[in-house]
Amino acid sequence: LTCLPQVLDTVGPQHVILLGHSDGASISAIYAGSIEDHRLWGVILIAPHFFTEPFGLAAIAKARTDFEQADLRDRLGKYHQHVDNCFRGWNDSWLHPDFREWNVSDCLDYIRVPVLAIQGHDDQYGSMAQINEVTDRCYAPVDMLALTDCRHAPYLDQPQATLDGVSDFCRRLADINV
């Protein structure tokens, strides 16, 4: 809750729609539910995590095996200068025994801006229960976009549907806030 406000203050936007994917979606939701920021018009949560699920942890354990024994390290290396630090920071955190009880769902109770929650039905790291948690707990209006034939990266598996959903949501927020 200290870094994101500093980034926003430095960049200096007057109006913000936070968009986060995976752990970034969790960060966006935590911010929206914890900080009263009048610049915030809405939040877009793509494949968010609010609690751990056994099958998701199993997929993260499989990712560790793929990183150590298959080609995942090479594939990620195209996107990350320090691929080992990046992967281990994520993977080791999620697989730490203390993390099994991790739950940040309470932040959803305090979100007071519109939310778009996007989830793939075939997400290997999180089930539809993640965005159902959003619709069940958020006080603010929530749009849900549940995509078939879609895993953890809707913008890759269903790019047009994801872009259309995000564009429509942003357009509607602009219309009501201008």
Q: Which functions belong to the PLM regions below?
A:
Residues 111, 117-119:
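Short beta-strand/loop motif that positions the catalytic acidic residue
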Residues 14-53:
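Conserved hydrolase catalytic core segment
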Residues 1-16:
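Conserved acidic catalytic loop of the alpha/beta-hydrolase fold
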Residues 142-143, 148-178:
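Catalytic active-site module of serine/aspartate enzymes centered on a nucleophile-bearing elbow/loop
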Residues 90-107:
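Active-site nucleophile elbow and catalytic-triad environment of alpha/beta-hydrolase enzymes
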Residues 122-126:
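Acidic catalytic loop of the alpha/beta-hydrolase fold
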Residues 56-81:
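A catalytic-pocket lid/entrance helix-loop region that shapes and gates access to the active site
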Residues 113, 127-136:
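Short alpha-helix in the alpha/beta-hydrolase fold that links the catalytic acid
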